[in-house]
Design a protein with these regions (language model features):
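ATP/NTP-dependent adenylation/nucleotidyl-transfer catalytic domains that generate, transfer
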Residues: 4-126
Length: 126
């Protein structure tokens, strides 16, 4: 329900809505299509989770941020990796180097395929 509010504020202020999803999450389709996936620009959309942490370290972000487990905060103790059933290290190794076990490749390739609709603009008839 936050998206209409964000866009109302952006329109009023003449701004764009910025996204916070990274390449690892986007590749896996780990976002809500018209929720956290709704934005105009995404400055970190091409960075993997590994690269986001490297970026944070480079700019001396507080240690508490750099060591926090990625979580959508949906419930106490929830983690992205727990929900995905795969680690971001495994995802990033595959995305960056093409290196993964057969099981990991299958998992990622399946997610890439079944979440394609989340990554496309609205389809409508001509």
């Amino acid at each position: 329900d936050a998206l209409p509010i964000l866009y109302t504020i952006a329109q009023t202020e003449g701004c764009l809505v910025a996204g916070t999803g990274n390449r690892s999450e986007i590749s896996m389709g780990y976002f809500t299509k018209w929720g956290d996936g709704g934005y105009d620009i995404n400055p970190i959309g091409d960075l993997t989770v590994r690269e986001v942490y490297e970026f944070l370290a480079y700019f001396n972000a507080p240690q508490s941020i750099r060591t926090k487990k990625p979580s959508a905060g949906l419930w106490e103790g929830q983690t992205d990796e727990g929900e995905l059933g795969i680690s971001y290290d495994e995802i990033d190794d595959y995305l960056l180097k093409g290196v993964a076990t057969s099981a990991v490749k299958q998992r990622i390739d399946k997610s890439l395929k079944i979440t394609q609709h989340k990554k496309k603009l609205i389809i409508y008839p001509d």
